[in-house]
Design a protein with these regions (language model features):
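Short, solvent-exposed loop/turn and secondary-structure capping segments
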Residues: 37, 56, 79, 90-93, ...
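Boundary at the C-terminal end of the N-terminal hydrophobic targeting segment
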Residues: 17-21
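Soluble non-cytosolic domains of exported or imported proteins
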Residues: 95, 104-111, 169-173
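Histidine-rich, glycine-flanked metal-binding segment
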Residues: 22, 31, 35-76
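Polyanionic/metal-chelating signatures
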Residues: 118-272
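Bacterial N-terminal signal peptides
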Residues: 5-15
Length: 272
């Protein structure tokens, strides 16, 4: 019964914190802090999804905060699942390169996985796809509570994953070869794009000198930045400084973000 009470207290915390809103206070027989110290007859106050006070029975509870009392319970920090591809409608993609994917579009907030994790005392999960790809999509850190992905999200910049453990039917060497080929292809594509942009610039300049008016550039309203200078990694090449996000496709943008150092990158290796 004591364990059940403890888990119920944990669930109460997460449900509040996951939504990043709401307030709750808990008084319990013991509160175990992250450093291992124990507070007897402790009080914990959470406001707007964040712990604001922790201490003994003398901690002041704001008048507008719901107080829950568990005189026999032990409150302790929840667990953090650092790496998981559960809780999604599809944990992996068949394509080897998928940096254009975002786990936001795949997480199922009502999956029983999140309910089971919450009951077990887990308060944060790093959900990231891609064990069966070479480069997977973007992950995020979520709490196992909330009715929408926005309510669940604790951090949306977990980064992407490179898997060097071979997927079914592949060897490790073929997995790494696919990664090298992807980088080589990107570099070739960028050089071709740079040359085309350089040529287009020369044509526009010639037309301008000839007195031919060009149509003014009109913003297309998409999310991609049209400013030049997007490529910051690697050696210089013709037209490198002219390339913008808008000149690339989704896969190329994801690869460039990795090589530019704009994405946190994790390496998945099932064995050393």
């Amino acid at each position: 019964m004591r364990l059940l009470t403890t888990l119920l207290v944990s669930s109460c915390f997460v449900a509040s914190a996951a939504a990043q809103s709401g307030s709750v206070a808990v008084k319990a027989a013991k509160i175990m802090r992250a450093d291992g110290s124990v507070i007897e007859q402790g009080t914990l106050v959470i406001e707007n999804g964040r712990i604001t006070s922790i201490g003994g029975s003398d901690v002041e509870v704001p008048f507008d905060v719901l107080l829950n009392e568990y005189p026999t319970a032990v409150v302790f920090p929840g667990f953090f699942e650092a790496h998981s591809n559960s809780g999604m409608d599809r944990a992996n993609e068949n394509v080897p390169l998928a940096p254009f994917l975002n786990v936001k579009d795949s997480i199922d907030p009502v999956s029983f996985y999140f309910e089971d994790e919450l009951r077990g005392g887990t308060v944060a999960i790093g959900v990231i796809p891609g064990n069966n790809t070479v480069i997977g999509g973007r992950g995020r850190v979520v709490a196992p509570a909330g009715m929408t992905i926005e309510q669940m999200t604790l951090s949306d910049d977990m980064g992407m994953k490179i898997a060097i453990g071979p997927k079914g039917g592949w060897s490790r060497s073929s997995q790494l070869a696919e990664l090298r080929e992807a980088v080589d292809k990107l570099n070739l594509d960028l050089r071709e794009i740079g040359e085309n942009l350089t040529y287009d610039g020369v044509v526009r300049e010639d037309r301008k000198k000839a007195g031919i008016e060009e149509d003014a550039d009109v913003a297309d309203g998409d999310m991609w930045d049209s400013a030049a200078g997007y490529i910051r990694f690697g050696d210089d090449f013709t037209g490198k400084g002219l390339i913008s996000e808008e000149d690339l496709d989704d896969t190329q943008r994801g690869m460039v973000d990795i090589l530019n150092g704009d994405e946190r990158l994790w390496v998945y290796a099932p064995s050393a």
